[in-house]
Every structure is written in structure tokens, then in C-alpha cells.
Amino acid sequence: SVCDLPESLIREFGISICPYYVCTDHGRFRDGEELRTDELLLHMAEGQTDYSQPPDVEDYERFFAEKLTEAQNVLHITMAKHVSQGYYNALEAAKSFENVTVLDSGHLSSSMGLMVLCASYMAERHFSKGEIVKNMKRLRRHISSAFIIDNTEMMCQAGKISRRVQIFCDALLLHPVIVLRKSRMVVGSMRTGDFAHMAKSYTKRVFLDSRNIDRRILFITYAGMDDQRLQYIRDLVQQYCPFERIYMQKASSAIASNCGPGSFGLLFMKKNEIVLNLSQASRPEETD
């Protein structure tokens, strides 16, 4: 559920999802099935404690067993292994099966989703499991995964950044840019100012090396933003680095519980040799 892909693409490629959990003061809920992002953000606005939790080993065992009734082999792509326990739980569950392979995406959210899309496309074209894994490990280095955080309180509560970093950011009105490097979440840089200023600064920096960017697909993945802010981000993208397809993707509740409202990421691939063709049916509407 944390790959943050639109339903149109999930349907097109027949992608199977093993949902994360979101734990609140009212219990534990399956991400996207029992708790939606908007509902979670209302909980957070009321000051309630929320955090994400990966599927248990038993959840993965049931998931893999079900999928193996439909296919001879299963390739499961997980969130970055140093960000979530999900990779290790899936790896443990895979020991019960001979034909389940678990792959660390090295990313999260729609950046991980890009790897899922490419792997699914290759599977549809009858690439072997070994070929897909080899290509995905290569692709991992060609994905740009960076989010800018509006308020660091949620990330601190989730243990993703230290209390010292949070205090520093609050005192100086700084917005950290969180990047994924070697499957680890690190603070790549800081942006200052109000939303308009920090969004423009972040966007300009992300697209600095535009000649090396694969412009086929961009995900603008966000949590708790109104239409005006989303349109402002789209306009910035058009100004600095237009893409063939731009998906405005609401982050899953599991992702939103970590980054908090007002955060967003510009997630895309750098130029690479992976072939990926999408149908017109899954093309995002221009007004999305």
C-alpha cells in the first residue's frame, strides 16, 4: 500500500498490494482499506498519536500463499529496508516458499511505485525473474526520491528524524528535504520561508540537472494539500521541467502518518534503458 500508485495503473498492470497498518488511539487499521489518508489527517489535526506499521510475517505468508495460487513465482518489492521492518518481515515469510523473491526497492512511496511499474511491465512481457531482479537493482540507482517536509513534528514522533533536528527546524523555520540514499532516509538539504518560497526553491533544485531526467512520468505525491497549492506545484513543474505524464498522487495513510500534512515529493526516474509504455486508459486527466 505504500507504493502510492493510482488505481488506474494498479488495474492496468494487475499489481497485488499487501497493505501496511496505521495505528491510532482507536486501534490498528489496514492502510487504504480501513483507514483513508483524509481520515488520518483529521486524527492528526486533533493531536492524536498515529504511526505506521508493516505487515506481520504471518500477513506476508498469507499474501504469498494466495498469490502462488495465481502465479508460479512471486516477486515482492518492499519499501527501503532501513526505513521499515517490512523488508525483513517479507524476507522471513518468504523462507516458507521456494518461489518467492523479496527485493528491497531502496525507496518509498511513488518512487518505490516506479520500480513496481517497471517490474510489472517486464513481467507482462515474460522476462525471467532473474532478469527482472537484475534490472530493478540497476534501476534503483536511477530513481529520484526526495520529499520536502512542511512540519517536522510527525517525522520526529515516527522516529525518522531526531528531536534535535526537529527543534532546529522549528526554531529557524526550516523545511528539511528528505532523500533516500542506500535505502536510508537522510536530510539532504534545508529550505526556508513560506510555502510558495520553499516549494519553488525545492522544485528548482530537484530539476537542476534536467538533461538527465526521464520525462515520461512524474509523481507529485502529497499529503494534506488544497487544490490551490497543488496547482502551484504543477505550474512550477511546467516551468522548470515539463513531463509527458504528471500524476497527482495522494500519499497513503501509512506514508502521511510519517511526513505529516503539507509535505510533498517530486518523484521520477533519471534517464535509463528500462522500457515502460503505459496505455492511454491510465493517462492522468489534465485537471487532476
Task: Enumerate the language-model features and the residues they cover.
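Short, well-structured alpha-helical segments in soluble
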Residues: 62-69
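Mixed-charge interfacial surface used for oligomerization/domain docking
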Residues: 2-24, 73, 83-101, 107-288
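N-terminal glycine-rich anion-binding loop in soluble enzyme alpha/beta folds
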Residues: 1-54
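Flexible, active-site-proximal loop/turn residues at the rims of small-molecule/cofactor binding pockets
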Residues: 80
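Glycine-rich, highly charged phosphate/nucleotide-binding loops
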Residues: 53-62
